[in-house]
């Protein structure tokens, strides 16, 4: 009788344990269904994309963490201890990673899916607002393949369209590596016409014009065109760019100011091009159509209608032809067209509408001769990196200031000078793209 009772109790215990296991299984199943998130098939239409759990999984798959020895959260907030540590870290040669080579990209792009996954490209639109507002890019490059790939990754979105112009003079392995990278994306292509780019000559403008023609012929209904070079990097997410471009309401944004007397000499004489650009004693005729000349820089944020008029409007084409033999025409062609009354999105030539590079959103640059004590009226503090052609190549100490500005991109970055600032910027932008919040 006692034995039978023990068996009954034992059987009851087993049933209780079995019931607990079944309950746990049901709860686990429900939780797994609730938190099911197939990152590989995640897209904008998926309900899962809106869940915090899926956002976390997506971020874990796509995050671009900087090396552990630097505190990017502190650097982006301007914490001086974190900045000093990053600058000291940058001085240690043994910690510097050699840049990825042309051969690396030629090998990894043999499997495009592996390349995009390993290099962590975002492969679907992150919002409907971004999907409905595609952006076009003209990317002019000539060296440093890793710089190009990291820039492309930072600005890449599948709804956008990207034209890449490679300098004809670039090494063949570099050109092949660029082709290999862009072959992995249906919305990235090589410009149909490539030119040899000579510093400060017309060829820099021609590279952008070639991309403009190709981009207008694409099937993507892009709204704005941004032009970039290999030392640029975005300081806004794609979503932030879309918002900023919408706020322009069809206007363009680029530097356009009255030229100094020294800059007027850039179009006073005819220039010749060999391997370099040199002036002649031949005086040029005045600008066509009595246009007042303005000066700016090579970078612009231009509406599609503006781009169309650059290529098709007879008055625009007369100015284009006139500036071809000037010095650094990219620094006065766009600035002058931005003040031409027939150009869509332009502004009047009146002094009230002069726009500095700090006011325009196209590009954030620190010029050496403007750096100084901000409390004494300087526009910005000294560069924490180094200078090249009087332009700051940013260091980690510049990042907090960079992120306080309204520009879409900044120039110049070079991982050989300071890779910490780029790593932190990549980590910051990727976190903000996925979560919409800062680090």
Swiss-Prot record:
Name of this protein: Beta-1,3-galactosyl-O-glycosyl-glycoprotein beta-1,6-N-acetylglucosaminyltransferase
Alphabetical keyword list: Disulfide bond, Glycoprotein, Glycosyltransferase, Host Golgi apparatus, Host membrane, Membrane, Signal-anchor, Transferase, Transmembrane, Transmembrane helix
Gene field: Bo17
Topological domains annotated Lumenal: 30-439
Pathway(s): Protein modification; protein glycosylation
Keyword Membrane: yes
Residue ranges the record marks as coiled coil: none
Family to which this protein belongs: Belongs to the glycosyltransferase 14 family.
Domain of life per record: Viruses
Function: Non-essential glycosyltransferase that can synthesize all known mucin beta 6 N-acetylglucosaminides. Mediates core 2 and core 4 O-glycan branching, 2 important steps in mucin-type biosynthesis. Has also I-branching enzyme activity by converting linear into branched poly-N-acetyllactosaminoglycans. Contributes to the post-translational modifications of structural proteins.
UniProt-annotated location(s): Host Golgi apparatus membrane
Catalysed reactions, as listed in the record: a 3-O-[beta-D-galactosyl-(1->3)-N-acetyl-alpha-D-galactosaminyl]-L-seryl-[protein] + UDP-N-acetyl-alpha-D-glucosamine = 3-O-{beta-D-galactosyl-(1->3)-[N-acetyl-beta-D-glucosaminyl-(1->6)]-N-acetyl-alpha-D-galactosaminyl}-L-seryl-[protein] + UDP + H(+); a 3-O-[beta-D-galactosyl-(1->3)-N-acetyl-alpha-D-galactosaminyl]-L-threonyl-[protein] + UDP-N-acetyl-alpha-D-glucosamine = a 3-O-{beta-D-galactosyl-(1->3)-[N-acetyl-beta-D-glucosaminyl-(1->6)]-N-acetyl-alpha-D-galactosaminyl}-L-threonyl-[protein] + UDP + H(+); a beta-D-Gal-(1->4)-beta-D-GlcNAc-(1->3)-beta-D-Gal-(1->4)-beta-D-GlcNAc derivative + UDP-N-acetyl-alpha-D-glucosamine = a beta-D-Gal-(1->4)-beta-D-GlcNAc-(1->3)-[beta-D-GlcNAc-(1->6)]-beta-D-Gal-(1->4)-N-acetyl-beta-D-glucosaminyl derivative + UDP + H(+); 3-O-[N-acetyl-beta-D-glucosaminyl-(1->3)-N-acetyl-alpha-D-galactosaminyl]-L-seryl-[protein] + UDP-N-acetyl-alpha-D-glucosamine = 3-O-[N-acetyl-beta-D-glucosaminyl-(1->3)-[N-acetyl-beta-D-glucosaminyl-(1->6)]-N-acetyl-alpha-D-galactosaminyl]-L-seryl-[protein] + UDP + H(+)
